[in-house]
Amino acid sequence: MDERLPERAHLVTEQVNPDSARLDRLDSPSLVELFCREDERVVPAVRAAAPAIARAIDLTAAALRGGGRLFYVGAGTSGRLGVLDASECPPTFCTDPEQVQGIIAGGTAALTRSVEGAEDDPEAGAAELAGRALSAADVVVGISAGGTAPYVSGALAYARSLGGVTIFVACVPTNQIPERWDIEIRVPVGPEVLAGSTRLKAGTATKLVLNILSTGAMVRLGKTYGNLMVDVAVSNQKLRDRAVRILTTLTELERTAALALLEASGLRVKVALLMHWSNQDPASCATALEAAGGLLPVALEKLSGR
């Protein structure tokens, strides 16, 4: 065997799915039914990885609380999913864009088109993190459906060399790709409907894992109140409306009064809530919130104890 071209036939992500062997013969309703049936494998696979995902949430939240950052690193579909999840954190949780970052092999050009060979360079993955001043305070989540992308392994190895937390997300079992990293989130969903096309079930499973990881970490950081998005960045009309509805829900104010409260707070939902509940001015509420590490109940207790 040519060592320059490693054999991947043993990987479940590369295997042929016998249930879709007649894919090219199916009519459209049958195609839809087949895809739906295969996608039913995804949630159980993610649920089976729940203990590892929970540990990843806790380590990530601790790192972010201490001033560290979260980096997603991947190639192709895996990289795009990481960039997607990272890009949703600022509007959803009002995070600094530097706090959660997505890195894709081949750079931004690879978001819309394939960059040939980009995933095959382990040094490039490490160099990208070095260029972003990675430190031991940070968390790196390497995403590789088949578990073999050198770009991802290079990034994880660099993170480990600095003492940072390393998390690996893959859709192959450990008997195919052995464990190497601090946390291994394995979500094997079986062969794809279209053999080797990991943008399908593997991509769906990866998206679910990242959804849970980032949202769970933000919940731990106090970015929600109950299940409400109280740290939403009010950057457009849709989000302004959402912020007003959050205020009406939690304060029982009428919509007009809630909008006035939001504007008085500087479009900061948490500050607006503290203003309403404590009858304090915006600056005092913002100061209490900062002192409480962004935790709304703790900030309210500080204000109420004055």
Swiss-Prot record:
InterPro entries to which the protein is assigned, alphabetical: Etherase_MurQ, Glucokinase_regulatory_CS, MURQ/GCKR, SIS_dom, SIS_dom_sf
Active-site residues, Swiss-Prot/TrEMBL: E88 (proton donor), E119
Domain SIS: 60-223
Catalyzed reactions per annotation: N-acetyl-D-muramate 6-phosphate + H2O = N-acetyl-D-glucosamine 6-phosphate + (R)-lactate
Pathway of action: Amino-sugar metabolism; N-acetylmuramate degradation
Pfam families: GKRP_SIS_N
Protein family according to the UniProt entry: Belongs to the GCKR-like family. MurNAc-6-P etherase subfamily.
Quaternary structure and partners: Homodimer.
The protein's role, per its UniProt record: Specifically catalyzes the cleavage of the D-lactyl ether substituent of MurNAc 6-phosphate, producing GlcNAc 6-phosphate and D-lactate.
Name of the protein in its database record: N-acetylmuramic acid 6-phosphate etherase
Lineage: Bacteria, Bacillati, Cyanobacteriota, Cyanophyceae, Gloeobacterales
Gene name linked to the record: murQ
